[in-house]
């Protein structure tokens, strides 16, 4: 196992969910956020002896693999120097807002992960853990070979980095489906058949956008096989970039 320590930059729902699963799977985690290590004391105590708090730069340096779970709008604050030479998992999704839009994403000139890779030019970015929610991540893991093991998509430009992330996800309890390059990562982005719903099932009818988000965050999850992920990817047609609730 090449990954023994996971660096995590960002401790929102995704970062914390992945940290919990990683610790339970036997990995060490180094957590960081924009507010400082002292603000993570309770979380670290809850996670136990395999977890510690640090600054983003320290987490980047410590991780054999690094999860950059910050809002996409904050991706340019990721520590480039400390992440140089590292494989970086990108679970970020584009959520355009009146105060923050990216024309290159709106026009499909780039995917959000290509934007991240442009900032982290000396790192190996792999898109993963962006289409399954933290609740489902903590409920759907299974041992290798289990008939109901769930698969998640990944994309990246570096084959070795994709293999590294696939190994990590296997440790967490998931199979993977390689969808291609970062330019292909839109196949599993927001508003595609591969985003969220394969892992939650169909929501109740008549939900408002906010009710839908709350429902997704609480759904215990349903397994999605590698064959199902491939089937959905093959049928995906590109639509508008970013969340369109």
Predicted segment positions?
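Short, conserved loop/helix-junction motifs that constitute active-site signature segments
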Residues: 80-85, 120-121, 144-146
């Amino acid at each position: 196992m090449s990954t023994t320590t996971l660096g995590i930059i960002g401790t929102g729902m995704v970062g914390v969910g992945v940290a919990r699963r990683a610790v339970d799977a036997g990995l060490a985690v180094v957590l960081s956020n924009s507010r400082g290590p002292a603000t993570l004391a309770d979380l670290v105590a809850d996670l136990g002896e395999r977890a510690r708090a640090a600054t983003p730069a320290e987490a980047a340096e410590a991780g054999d693999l690094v999860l950059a779970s910050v809002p996409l709008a904050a991706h340019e604050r990721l520590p480039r120097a400390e992440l140089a030479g590292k494989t970086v998992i990108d679970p970020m999704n584009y959520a355009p807002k009146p105060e923050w839009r990216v024309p290159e994403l709106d026009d499909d000139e780039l995917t959000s992960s290509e934007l991240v890779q442009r900032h982290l030019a000396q790192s190996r970015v792999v898109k993963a853990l962006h289409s399954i929610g933290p609740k489902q991540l903590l409920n759907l893991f299974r041992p290798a070979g289990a008939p109901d093991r769930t698969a998640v998509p990944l994309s990246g430009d570096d084959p070795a980095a994709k293999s590294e992330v696939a190994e990590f996800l296997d440790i967490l309890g998931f199979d993977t489906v390689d969808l291609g390059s970062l330019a292909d990562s839109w196949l599993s982005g927001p508003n595609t058949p591969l985003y969220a719903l394969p892992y939650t099932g169909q929501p109740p009818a008549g939900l408002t956008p906010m009710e839908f988000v709350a429902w997704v965050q609480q759904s215990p999850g349903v397994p999605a096989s590698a064959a199902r992920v491939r089937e959905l990817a093959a049928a995906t047609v590109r639509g508008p970039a970013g969340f369109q609730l």
